[in-house]
Amino acid sequence: MKTKAGKQKKRSVDSDDDVSRERRPKRATSGTNFKEKSLRFSEKYETVEAKKEQIVGDDEKEEKGVRFQSFGRVENWTISGYEDGSPVIWISTVIADYDCRKPSKKYKKLYDYFFEKACACVEVCKNLSTNPDTSLKELLAAVVRSMNGRKIFSSGGVIQEFVISQGEFIYNQLAGLDETSKNHETKFVDNRVLVSLRDESRKIHKAFSNVALRIDESKVLTSDQLMDGGEDEDLKYAKLLQEEEHMKSMDRSRNKRSSTTSAPNKFYIKINEDEIAHDYPLPSYYKNTKDETDELVLFNAGYAVDARNLPCRTLHNWALYNSDLMLISLEFLPMKPCADIDVTYLGQIKEWKIDFGEDMIFVLLRTDMAWYRLGKPSEQYAPWFEPILKTVRIGTSILALLKNETRMAKLSYTDVIKRLCGLEENDQAYISSTFFDVERYVIVHGQIILQFLTECPDEYIKRCPFVTGLASKMQDRHHTKWIIKKKRKMLQKGENLNLRRGKAPKVSKMKAMQATTTRLINRIWGEFYSIYSPEDPLEEIGAEEEFEEVEDVEEEDENEEEDTIQKAIEVQKADTLKKIRGSCKEMEIRWEGEILGETCAGEPLYGQALVGGRKMDVGGAVILEVDDQGETPLIYFVEYMFESSDNSKKLHGKLLQRGSETVLGTAANERELFLTNECLTVQLKDIKGTVSFEIRSRPWGHQYKKEHMAADKLDRARAEERKAKDLPIEYYCKSLYSPEKGGFFSLPRSDMGLGSGFCSSCKIRENEEERSKTKLNDSKTRFLSNGIKYSVGDFVYQIPNYLSKDRGKRRPVFKYGRNVGLRAFVVCQILDIVDLKEPKKGNTTSFEVKVRRFYRPDDVSAEEAYASDIQEVYYSEDTYILPPEAIKGKCEVMKKTDMPLCREYPILDHVYFCDRFYDSSNGCLKKLPYNMMLKFSTIKDDTLLREKKTETGSAMLLKPDEVPKGKRLATLDIFAGCGGLSYGLEKAGVSDTKWAIEYEEPAAQAFKQNHPKTTVFVDNCNVILRISWLRLLINDRAIMEKCGDVDDCISTTEAAELATKLDENQKSTLPLPGQVDFISGGPPCQGFSRLNRFSDGSWSKNQCQMILAFLSFADYFRPKYFLLENVKTFVSFNEGHTFHLTVASLLEMGYQVRFGLLEAGAYGISQPRKRAFIWAAAPNEVLPEWPEPMHVFNNPGFKIPLSQGLHYAAVQSTKFGAPFRSITVRDAIGDLPPIESGESKINKEEMRGSMTVLTDHICKKMNELNLIRCKKIPKTPGADWRDLPDEHVNLSNGIVKNIVPNLLNKAKDHNGYKGLYGRLDWHGNLPTCITNLQPMGLVGMCFHPDQDRIISVRECARSQGFPDSYKFSGNIKDKHRQVGNAVPPPLAFALGRKLKEALHLRNI
């Protein structure tokens, strides 16, 4: 009880409560009938004043309460009710104690806030009393659960923040209870969780700086001063005001909350339970078989300001039950947030919905924390979920009926019911053949069907007679009507500033089609979403629709975090080492069998041991427990066992990681383990047991598919049977998981479980430690650093920042000018190695390196850089003394006569030439004198020799290693576009694109023009896959039966019909399994692109599903190599599930898989273009490495989140240096002739390479106003709409317009719309190439640096790295689309070179 401000509190209601009541009568006060001044009950107040308005009469009855003429000094206040679980607030005067119940309206807000503080105290007390060893996270979750549903809080996240913010208050209240506690009871004051809560509260108050009022912490008093009542009155009042401010912020947070679903109707018709009981099992209780965890413990509480932004997670093995543990149906819960819901009954489920695409249907439910996609229910709950699925299938059947009807208005409610009666019994939507039974089922389950149809984007379906008729029938059946909560509108000042408001999405003629898949792909993705299995595929919804056409675009992020130091490549690691829990139990441990040999330390090796009666073998798997409570036990593969010199029996093993702990996450098979390179040595006595474990090895090839499918089916059935019998899991391992390399690799079987004392992981670690050392040899003429040997005379790279003169200030950064000022590596030659007697301060080595600097043309001037070759360097007499850590690698400097005269391919070799001398003292540049002795690099690779001029004097181009077409990989390019990916791969000398599939006619024509020997199929890839399967079925049925392909293709009726229409000649040219070596392509990425406004549309969702078709091609043909390209956000789209399932699918096929993110601008193009890639290679092939980025480019380094705090970066960021400078706008387009806005003349004069005519140097025509704006934009770097003069102009039609765009002038919330109507900088880079350039579009910086026009098609093509000889097809819009959708050929070339290296390694 708190007697004075600052003193400890006591229990006010205890076993002596009756005595206290006799001593001091307690009365209930009611402040509802008199006006009072604003009251604040806090530690500051000791008296309460009330305005005297009414006097207590003698005839007032005590039980009705009294109204006071005056109210004396308040001595103290108290919180009681801890035993009852409901707080009671008391205030005391000298005369009596008062139970505070209903406050006045004016005081209600303040009192409610204080009452919630008291509730939090009671709930924390209750939870700690029953479970004092709980964790802070579990305590917060329990309190949030108990306090959820109160009107003052908008979500669980707000409750959690409130409880934490009141941590010190709660601690003080509960610590006061210790005075009356018994000796055997746990003291609150020492409770570690309560102390942690208090400490968290202090951290929040310390950081509470976003309000106008802040307490001066220098004046906070000590606890002794508080006990003496010495706290300053103003300080108390300041604390109170700060708390009020916090309360108001919670109020604002609550008011901003908006519903996710806009209600098309005013009412939600609730299902009548009695009507649907017939379709469900008999009532039963939920049986808990496994430990359950509160979602608030697993995930951080969120505010749910907009439920559309909630994360989406997947639930498996789930059940739905009420507070009485009775199983209930989802139909009892509303599909919309409603006002009349019994929140206590419904618990945390706010709403549920049905989401459907062209392939699958999902059932989702929402809590405050997340959306949950419902996977397979528990075995007990499955009968309760089946009616929901059946109703959904009926809904899809009705939707198909409506869409197939020419005029929906003709199809009445009765007509639909009659058609449902006429369905076959084997139809998934079959109910009965009796009209009465069908109508009853449709009406009583009508809310699901009604919601399913009204969510359809087709307005005709929403208003069709069946929908209105069904709603009417449901109301006539006396279902309950709930009022739907209205969607709260966010405050919007002024006019709508959305640039795309009022602009309807453009309509494409493309039709959506359900993906054609193989059964393996259908099973993997179907099991994850757990609605339809391979044996029960989703029925076709389909009818033709018009869909939104969207762009693949990725805008440069101006707010990316700037790194200040150079970071390492590969993986950012979390602390993954876990302490193994030892065993104190005595057990018998002995070796079995003979000694197999000795370790390198002379310790005897054994192949088998008995530990507590359990046999352990080399090559088996064991379980180890960790000290962290709640952590899953670890599984280790036994490499060898030995007895140490101190007679301890030990084993050395490698970690076998569960799939869920890898990048696969929830997409992994729970039985599959992955070998890793994490190893340890542990005593046998600490082993907790063994597991059933198999190293799974299978032959590779399409011809083994039937055998593997049958084996997998039996394996899954056996696993389900063991799971049902609660038997231990039987694990298997097929791959090595290496997060450091970002992939899954074939197992090193020749090095595994030999029992010889050798561990490949230990060897890798030793090599890495050796590489990290810097050593000087005895002769002091060479040294080793990062695994590279350097000698006197070598040409090397040096990090730019080590030279003081290169640390100049960069120009101001503007959009697409972020590369300006970035420096490439400095080329140097080692002259001498200087031995130091002792390391200098700040150096870690005892020697330094003397180097000669070679200058680059860009060190002289920008003009010199543009006019010179990017591989040219200048000799100088400048020398420097550098520490060895400044050296970044080796390069070569050659004579100019040994270099090619011109290049067609991007630079992938560290080679330079020098024939000029630069004097840095006066900036003079001259021919290199013959008397200067320069030892050039020796030519080791014949391909780098300069091609001799022919008799006509024309120069030949540098060509990569020529590989005969017959020895190249026979390639199928899917989603081929105009052929950028195929072009680069072919130029690398590794690929021969024999087949290509492209849906759009103009892009397909462009592909044919540039790849005349390729067979191009202009059709939907789903149809082509179906045809390939049919062709083999008709011509080689025996082969298909042998390979298990007879029923392997799952496709829609539409795809099957279109497959029959393909020309027979083209059908005969389709490849067969075994003929395709390499599949490459970039599935449509509209649904993944983060700047796609319409990514939730039907067309975009369908395009996302093309991943399934693409993977099915790989499964059907089983090529040696597979390459997937997509936008960067592919790895994070849909919470990463799509990316995880893609990798899981390839692993299930037996492939090795590697993934990474690359910046195309670092490979020789003049634009930022971040792309995700997934390589897959057959188990007996070598996975390609990622190509080294060669050009400076300002990017932060892109990392893929793995698991357990790990992040993987495929390559190192080049913002701090690279072998070559970035490619500028001037490099890319500076030599093109000037043209006018709207230029349409296709052919121009001779340009680059051996071209005699320049094509496609044409640009879009702007309207009159935009052309005027373009002319008014200054021709200076970074100029955009903000530089326009504020004036009006008369247009030719007589209309007067303001030159400054009105919307942009008011758009303060969009970073000023930087770059719109922007002019490019000669020294910067071009914007990301998109399919539709507009000055007011998503990428608005599209004006030529010197000319008043939008950049041309050819200029865009050059920014992508296409040569001038490359042709495009169609109109100007088609050509822009082809360029914008293409993979940059230089990046494809770099990937192809690495694939070529992998093939070379495979053949060694």
Curated annotation (Swiss-Prot):
GO biological process: DNA methylation-dependent constitutive heterochromatin formation; embryo development ending in seed dormancy; methylation
EC number of this enzyme: 2.1.1.37
Biased composition range(s): Basic residues: 1-10
Entry keyword Nucleus: yes
Primary localization: nucleus
Coiled coil stretches, renumbered: none
Reactions accelerated catalytically: a 2'-deoxycytidine in DNA + S-adenosyl-L-methionine = a 5-methyl-2'-deoxycytidine in DNA + S-adenosyl-L-homocysteine + H(+)
Keywords, in A-Z order: Chromatin regulator, DNA-binding, Isopeptide bond, Methyltransferase, Nucleus, Repeat, S-adenosyl-L-methionine, Transferase, Ubl conjugation
Record domain BAH: where: 614-748, 788-929
GO MF assignments: chromatin binding; DNA (cytosine-5-)-methyltransferase activity; DNA binding
First-level EC class: transferase
Chain ranges of the SAM-dependent MTase C5-type domain: 969-1402
PANTHER family linked to this entry: CYTOSINE-SPECIFIC METHYLTRANSFERASE (PTHR10629), DNA (CYTOSINE-5)-METHYLTRANSFERASE 1 (PTHR10629:SF52)
Listed NCBIfam families: dcm (TIGR00675)
Protein task: Maintains chromatin CpG methylation that plays a role in genomic imprinting, regulation of embryogenesis and seed viability. Required for proper patterns of CG DNA methylation in dividing cells. Required during the endosperm development in seeds.
Protein name: DNA (cytosine-5)-methyltransferase 3
Gene encoding the protein: MET3
